[in-house]
């Protein structure tokens, strides 16, 4: 096996630098356990400071939390790819992100058998490292205009205990804004494997989940679960 991009050979010829996955070692013959095609590291460092507080009075149980998170990311390529000879080997440089979030919830325990829980949260977080590069297997280029993603979420659940039966129903609604997503496909026009990166992706996820547990004995129980949900894009993305 020769370490070249077979998709590009027909258009550029087997001796072109363009088809080489590792220009510094052209037409290298691959043996068992060799690294070929691509070789890179994604270095991600995170630091997180988190605080949570709980308070109870009567039937009310309150909880609140907040966090601050710092993230750095870097791609370090170990091969000089023929499709990006100047931008594939070595360090990409470092991208830095500062984010955080908060959550708030309340549980109302009416009695030993009935509990209602409400919660909401917001998170501002760094994008996924793999999606932050234009073509992570080949290039060190960051996606232009990278920014933090924003996640809003809310949920409500009701728990019921009746004898040996415990039932819980949960509804959730999540808004995801400013996401970065990536798809890969073969591009016939350019005769090569291509990455399509989309920024400013906005989505919404919502649904209902239910579970029932019937405790026959202390060692035997039956469980039933069901869920219905939907996930959809809410507007046009940038690509």
Question: What do these predicted ranges mean?
Answer:
Residues 173-175, 193-239:
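Gram-negative outer-membrane beta-barrel transporters
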Residues 49-55, 68, 104-108, 156-160, ...:
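Residues on the lipid-exposed face of transmembrane beta-strands in outer-membrane beta-barrel proteins
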Residues 1, 64-70, 118-122, 169-173, ...:
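Transmembrane beta-barrel strands of outer-membrane/channel proteins
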Residues 72-83, 94, 108-154, 166-167, ...:
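Surface-exposed extracellular loop regions of Gram-negative outer-membrane beta-barrel proteins
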Residues 59-62, 113-116, 164-167, 219-222:
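Repeated loop/turn-to-beta-strand initiation elements of outer-membrane beta-barrel proteins
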Residues 43-47, 96-100, 150-154, 161-163, ...:
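Residues that define the transmembrane beta-barrel architecture of outer-membrane proteins
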Residues 1-6, 163-169:
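Internal hydrophobic scaffold segments of catalytic domains
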Residues 1-111, 126, 131-133, 238:
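Signature of Gram-negative outer-membrane beta-barrel scaffolds
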